[in-house]
């Protein structure tokens, strides 16, 4: 009789927390296994199969391995691990001859790691987070406390944005990750937030490659968009119908439009720089216009729900990568808006862990 642990009830609190504590280091193992799985296209191979249920040998035969038989034995262990972490389901059947056949298929969790109909997924963000350039920064995390240094700067000698400008591989990895995450987030935002309706022109300040505007305009094709970012950023931006890429510096000035979008910009900067950005937006805004800020938000008191865990994790990322970058509370955002001259601050929607804030003069 096969051993199953699903019916084991652990009621001893000390045992529960000890097992949870022992599982903490496994977070690193999971991320590195997922990195390998993505690089080998394991999830995409399963997704593209006609049955969406494949054995380890069937998967191994579709990856560039020299020996599928030997590789399938290693792969079987990896697939079992991913199934134990809810990224796959395991299906075991026995034919009339008593031969056991094991196959694996995707779960809702692993669906986020395969490309959707628009070609976006969370996979590029995981590859960015597990890249040696990013990982090396975490080895200097304690220096943020001991020496007041930025871990990324300590590891690489330059600011993260400066590093991306010099390393084309890392810059491409970063841009792909941000484009995919932004696409996923913005598709949900345009579903739950109707504040773009009736708007004629939008400028996306710090818009990167323009994916936020492209997603908005796909739903509201009458909108004309300006994607505003540094010249070296927009030079790689693709052409989108209805979008003009304009080079500039948001710390100097922002072009005037009736709606100014700031998505995941303020969390990159300290309070002083944030106020400078917001003041430039205030100056560029017509009297009846609005600034739409999209950011993660910290609760006033630490909470253990998924939204809070996500924002707290990203706050640690900001601490590691950027000088002054951080996730903020509602009150902290409101204080920044007031300092910049805005009189109306409204939280109007939430998509996943992103909050949509409207600012008015």
From Swiss-Prot:
Keywords: Methyltransferase, S-adenosyl-L-methionine, Transferase. Gene3D superfamilies: Vaccinia Virus protein VP39, Winged helix-like DNA-binding domain superfamily/Winged helix DNA-binding domain. InterPro entries: COMT-like, O_MeTrfase_dom, Plant_O-MeTrfase_dimerisation, SAM-dependent_MTases_sf, WH-like_DNA-bd_sf, WH_DNA-bd_sf. The active site is at residue 267. The keyword Transferase applies. It catalyses: kaempferol + S-adenosyl-L-methionine = 3-O-methylkaempferol + S-adenosyl-L-homocysteine + H(+); quercetin + S-adenosyl-L-methionine = 3',4',5,7-tetrahydroxy-3-methoxyflavone + S-adenosyl-L-homocysteine + H(+); myricetin + S-adenosyl-L-methionine = 3-O-methylmyricetin + S-adenosyl-L-homocysteine + H(+); kaempferide + S-adenosyl-L-methionine = 3,4'-O-dimethylkaempferol + S-adenosyl-L-homocysteine + H(+). Its EC number is 2.1.1.-, 2.1.1.76. Pathway: Flavonoid metabolism. GO terms for molecular function: kaempferol 3-O-methyltransferase activity; O-methyltransferase activity; protein dimerization activity; quercetin 3-O-methyltransferase activity. S-adenosyl-L-methionine binds at residue 229. GO terms for biological process: flavonoid biosynthetic process; methylation. It comes from the Eukaryota. PANTHER family: O-METHYLTRANSFERASE (PTHR11746). Flavonoid 3-O-methyltransferase involved in the biosynthesis of polymethoxylated flavonoids natural products such as myricetin derivatives, aroma compounds possessing antioxidant properties and exhibiting pharmacological activities such as anti-carcinogen, anti-viral, anti-thrombotic, anti-diabetic, anti-atherosclerotic, and anti-inflammatory effects. Catalyzes S-adenosylmethionine-dependent regioselective 3-O-methylation of flavonoids; active on various hydroxylated flavonoid substrates. Belongs to the class I-like SAM-binding methyltransferase superfamily. Cation-independent O-methyltransferase family. This is Myricetin 3-O-methyltransferase 3. The lineage of its organism: Eukaryota, Viridiplantae, Streptophyta, Embryophyta, Tracheophyta.
């Amino acid at each position: 009789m096969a051993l199953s642990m699903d019916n084991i009830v652990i009621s001893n609190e000390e045992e529960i927390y000890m097992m949870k504590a022992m599982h903490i280091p496994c977070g690193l193992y999971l991320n590195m296994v997922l990195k390998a799985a993505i690089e080998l296209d394991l999830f995409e191979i399963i997704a593209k199969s006609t049955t969406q249920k494949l054995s380890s040998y069937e998967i191994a035969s579709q990856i560039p391995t020299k020996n599928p038989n030997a590789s399938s034995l290693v792969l079987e262990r990896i697939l079992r691990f991913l199934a134990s972490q809810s990224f796959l389901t395991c299906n075991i059947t026995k034919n009339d001859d008593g031969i056991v056949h094991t196959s694996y298929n995707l779960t809702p969790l692993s669906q986020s790691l395969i490309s959707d109909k628009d070609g976006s997924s969370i996979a590029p963000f995981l590859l960015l987070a597990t890249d040696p350039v990013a990982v090396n920064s975490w080895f200097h995390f304690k220096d943020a406390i001991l020496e007041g240094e930025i871990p990324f700067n300590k590891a690489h000698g330059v600011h993260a944005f400066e590093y991306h400008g010099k390393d084309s591989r890392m810059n491409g990895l970063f841009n792909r990750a941000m484009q995919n995450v932004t696409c996923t987030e913005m598709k949900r935002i345009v579903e739950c937030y109707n504040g773009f309706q009736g708007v004629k022109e939008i400028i996306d300040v710090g818009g990167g490659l323009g994916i936020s505007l492209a997603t908005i305009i796909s739903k509201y094709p009458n909108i004309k968009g300006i994607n505003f970012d540094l010249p070296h950023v927009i030079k790689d931006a693709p052409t989108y119908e209805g979008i003009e890429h304009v080079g500039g510096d948001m710390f100097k000035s922002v072009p005037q439009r009736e709606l100014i979008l700031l998505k995941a910009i303020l969390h990159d900067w300290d309070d002083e720089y944030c106020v400078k950005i917001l003041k430039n937006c205030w100056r560029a805004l017509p009297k009846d216009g609005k600034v739409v800020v999209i950011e993660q938000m910290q609760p006033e008191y630490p909470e253990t729900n998924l939204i809070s865990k996500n924002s707290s994790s990203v706050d640690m990322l900001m601490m590691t990568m950027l000088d002054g970058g951080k996730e903020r509370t509602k009150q902290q955002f409101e204080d920044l808006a007031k300092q910049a001259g805005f009189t109306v601050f409204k939280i109007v929607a939430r998509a996943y862990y992103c909050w949509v804030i409207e600012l008015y003069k």
